[in-house]
Amino acid sequence: MSLDFDLYVVTDRQLTGGQPLRLVVEAALRGGARAFQLREKDLPPRELYPLALEMRRLTQTYGARLLINDRVDVALAVDADGVHLTTTSLPASVARQVLGPGRLIGVSTHTLAEAQAAAGEGADFLVFGPVFFTPSKAPYGEPVGLDALRVVRAAVRLPILAIGGVKKANLDQVLAAGADGIAVISAVIGADDPMAASQDLLATLRSRRANAASQPSP
């Protein structure tokens, strides 16, 4: 399948500089972002639920997609567009049985084997990385690099969003390595101006794609 977004904003309320997450997400929405993953792993379900409900109402207002990290139950409870899994979550095939056919399932992967496993289990798209160094992904090990992204792109037919230190300056490299889009945390959630950051990333993505489309086929 194809995705209807190429910028996937992942939340982290610890990066908002004290601003309510709602205000930061709304600023990103005003900047054109149309896909979000609510990823607040420290919150128990009872606290995550009202935040997820708030995010669902907000994203619906803008016609944007909302996926919930890991919690299939919370995703269903707030009528989210899907769930985002990790390699330690429920398998995508099991999540699909619970969610039904109409919701998205994304899976975070860090190796070719993980990417192939997620594809085999029925994921709709992959987030692969960290491609470059970023503090938020440091616990997941060293950056995998662009070569690993190329290998996964050649082996897996699903849409792939690159994550980990991805920014305007290296977008060309990431797209050239085969990414269909990008997933970002600090580049938007931690930005001084999340609206402008979203606008800038989206404009750069559109420009790069337009340039690629205008190039003659080899």
Where are these regions (language model features)?
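A short, flexible beta-alpha/helix-coil linker loop
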Residues: 13, 132-134
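Short acidic/polar capping segments at secondary-structure boundaries
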Residues: 133, 166-167
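Glycine/threonine-rich flexible loop motifs
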Residues: 136-138
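C-terminal binding/interaction regions
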Residues: 177, 181-184
